[in-house]
Each structure stands twice: as structure tokens, then as C-alpha cells.
């Protein structure tokens, strides 16, 4: 008969074999401080609704703010999901993951206008924007990728409804995976 292998607990692992979540946030308190700092930032982006085609400067300003917030959200998300995956029975990280997921729904609802508005900008107008504001070209690839999905994009209202329902879908999936 074969030898039974002992599966190491996280506390028994060598540090070099573990994720270095402290490279993202030094502590849970640092994560909580950053999470508190971004709460409401999605509303600053929502203020651009109906304005993205106003001028190249407005579009560039929105894209920069969205990118900056997106990177901050990505760090928050990665930290909570990695910490949760370290020990899926740890209720502290289940809670942080739940908070983060809830915030993502709010963010998606607040920015549901982005894709439909970018798609609605006529190609000639967009080319004119690039000429008037060369810095906007930094986002040219992004704009192309958004616009090529035109046939598959819903209206702002429909995108917002889908964003709102994503929390319900996530909870169902999480329950299934936890009990599997």
C-alpha cells in the first residue's frame, strides 16, 4: 500500500511557497483604509454620463480617472480573493470578499454608460478627437476593442440592470462551489 501524504496547512508552508499578499497591501488595515478611500469614487465617474462625446478633453479625463480607479480596485480585488483562497473557511476574508464584490456591482452600475457612449461616438468624431488631443491616442486600442463589440452591447439601462443582477449570480455560484 502507498504512503499517505500529509497535506500541509498554510501555517505549515514555507513563506517562499506562499503568495506575497503584503506586496499588494501590508495588512488588512491598509486594505480597509484603501477600500474606505475609494467608496464613492464610482460616483465621480458616473458624473460623466452623457458627456463622453462632449469633447476630447472630457473623454480623456474620464478615461484617465476610470483607469486610475480601476487599478486601485484591481489591487483591492486581488488582495481579498487571494486572502480568501488561502483559507476558504476564514470568515474574515469571506466578509472582505463579499464587500469587494458588492462594491464591484456598484462600480459596474455607476459606469454602465461607458461602453454604450463610446460606441455611440461617430468614427469621424473619434478621429477628430485623436487629432485635437494626441494624448487620447494612449487609449486608441482600448477604444477600438470597445467599439468592435458594438453588435453585442446593450443600452445603458440594460447594462445597468445586468450589473445589478451580477451580485445575485455571484451568490448562487459561491453557494454551489462552497457545498461542492
Where are these regions (language model features)?
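A well-structured
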Residues: 1-176, 180
Amino acid at each position: 500500500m502507498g504512503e499517505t501524504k500529509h497535506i500541509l496547512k498554510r501555517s505549515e508552508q514555507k513563506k517562499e511557497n506562499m503568495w506575497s499578499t503584503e506586496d499588494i497591501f501590508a495588512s488588512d488595515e491598509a486594505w480597509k483604509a484603501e477600500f474606505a478611500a475609494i467608496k464613492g469614487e464610482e460616483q465621480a465617474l458616473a458624473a460623466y454620463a452623457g458627456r463622453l462625446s462632449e469633447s476630447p478633453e472630457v473623454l480623456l479625463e474620464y478615461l484617465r480617472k476610470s483607469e486610475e480607479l480601476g487599478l486601485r480596485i484591481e489591487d483591492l480585488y486581488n488582495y481579498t480573493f487571494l486572502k480568501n483562497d488561502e483559507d476558504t473557511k476564514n470568515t474574515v476574508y469571506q466578509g472582505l470578499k463579499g464587500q469587494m464584490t458588492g462594491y464591484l456591482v456598484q462600480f459596474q452600475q455607476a459606469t454602465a454608460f461607458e461602453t454604450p457612449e463610446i460606441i455611440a461616438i461617430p468614427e469621424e468624431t473619434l478621429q477628430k478627437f485623436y487629432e485635437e488631443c494626441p494624448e487620447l491616442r494612449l487609449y486608441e486600442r482600448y477604444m477600438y476593442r470597445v467599439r468592435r463589440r458594438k453588435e453585442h452591447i446593450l443600452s445603458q439601462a440594460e447594462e445597468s440592470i445586468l450589473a445589478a443582477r451580477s451580485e445575485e449570480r455571484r451568490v448562487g455560484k459561491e453557494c454551489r462551489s462552497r457545498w461542492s
